[in-house]
């Protein structure tokens, strides 16, 4: 059956209605009123993050230059010569029954073996840190993929690396939420929303605790040298704990590489975010007039520690940030200021009594 045609409808008004914008009347502000306004700042974080990501990728995956190949070839040739000379000395000592020389050769072999073993271990740990960057790239590709079959195996590998047991409630919820009809993007997204926040919450607690300790230490300590040593030790310890949470075992060189990348990231991004975050509270609440100089320095050191922890978290995390779940300095700012104010109030209360 065919439906009957609807009758024609005639409209009285024109199709295009001229919209005249309405402007408010002009207002003039004096100097006192102008001081209450702050200029609007454009959010340049995505551009900075993209530039920082490129710098980090270049540092994690350096190019194989000719000089680097020549140095590596020279070291390999020198190592082969040392091994050959050691074998020749050992054979001569055995033939001449020079037991003292034979013992020296055995001791040298043990020392060389220990050195080679430590170098191999450090190289493996540094390779593991570089692999984490490749895993983030793979996760980013899977989050834009409509294929099937790779997402589940990838997420199970991440859970195994992080030490998450199969009976963990978050992992069980993830298993219950996925099914065969979902593509890789949906599987990885579910893992990022159900399982990954468990590790992120632990890393946030570590950052909050280290930032609070740095803030209070600077606020109450009168010795600058002790403050510097304490902050350096706490920052290195924070990086180690965050790397351990995300399943990365840091060696000496990989720890230096990660610390270098974190400092490079902070220096490249600049202090604009730090100044903006601190100024939001200090300008609005006039805390600069109520807090001492040491307390202000403590808050600054705590925020720098928090920023370092956030960047270390970003480098060790196997998944890229999605849905604006990246922690910000504002998450730790109010907590640090509240702790400093509480500490100062506790210090004034006994003196008043």
UniProtKB/Swiss-Prot annotation:
Which Pfam families does the entry link to?
DUF697 (PF05128)
Q: Name one GO cellular component term.
A: plasma membrane
The UniProt entry, under InterPro entries, shows: DUF697, UPF0283
Q: Tell where it localizes.
A: Cell inner membrane
Transmembrane ranges? 70-90, 100-120, 213-233
Q: Main localisation, per the record?
A: membrane
Q: What is the membrane topology listed in the Swiss-Prot or TrEMBL record? A: Multi-pass membrane protein
Keywords annotated in UniProt:
Cell inner membrane, Cell membrane, Membrane, Transmembrane, Transmembrane helix
The entry assigns this protein to a family as follows:
Belongs to the UPF0283 family.
Return the PANTHER family for the record: UPF0283 MEMBRANE PROTEIN YCJF
The record's listing under NCBIfam families reads: hyp_HI0043
Q: What is this protein called?
A: UPF0283 membrane protein YcjF
**What is the originating organism of this protein?**
Escherichia coli O127:H6 (strain E2348/69 / EPEC)
């Amino acid at each position: 059956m065919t439906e009957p045609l609807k009758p024609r409808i005639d409209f009285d008004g024109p199709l295009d209605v001229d919209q005249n914008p309405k402007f408010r009347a002009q207002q003039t502000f004096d100097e006192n009123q102008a001081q209450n306004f702050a200029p609007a700042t454009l959010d340049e974080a995505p551009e900075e993050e993209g530039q920082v990501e490129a710098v980090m990728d270049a540092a994690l995956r350096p190019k194989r230059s000719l000089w680097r190949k020549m140095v590596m070839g020279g070291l390999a040739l020198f190592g082969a010569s040392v091994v050959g000379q050691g074998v020749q000395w050992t054979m001569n000592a055995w033939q001449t029954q020079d037991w003292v020389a034979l013992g020296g050769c055995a001791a040298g072999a043990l020392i060389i073996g220990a050195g080679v073993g430590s170098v191999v271990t450090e190289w493996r740990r540094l390779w593991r840190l570089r692999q984490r960057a490749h895993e983030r790239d793979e996760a980013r590709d899977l989050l834009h993929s409509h294929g099937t079959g790779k997402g589940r195996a990838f997420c199970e590998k991440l859970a195994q690396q992080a030490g998450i047991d199969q009976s963990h409630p978050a992992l069980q919820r993830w298993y219950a939420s996925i099914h065969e009809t979902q593509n890789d993007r949906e599987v990885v997204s579910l893992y990022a929303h159900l399982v990954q926040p468990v590790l992120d919450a632990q890393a946030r607690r570590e950052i909050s605790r280290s930032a609070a300790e740095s803030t209070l230490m600077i606020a109450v300590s009168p010795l600058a040298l002790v403050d510097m040593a304490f902050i350096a030790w706490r920052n290195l310890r924070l990086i180690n704990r965050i790397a351990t949470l995300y399943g990365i075992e840091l060696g000496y060189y990989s720890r230096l590489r990660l610390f270098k990348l974190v400092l490079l990231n902070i220096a490249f991004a600049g202090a604009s975010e730090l100044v903006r975050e601190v100024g939001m509270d200090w300008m609005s609440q006039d805390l600069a007039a109520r807090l001492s100089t040491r307390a202000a320095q403590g808050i600054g050191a705590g925020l720098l520690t928090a920023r370092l922890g956030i960047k270390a978290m970003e480098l060790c995390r196997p998944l890229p940030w999605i849905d604006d779940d990246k922690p910000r300095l504002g998450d730790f700012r109010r907590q640090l200021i509240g702790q400093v104010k509480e500490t100062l109030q506790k210090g004034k209360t006994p003196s008043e009594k």
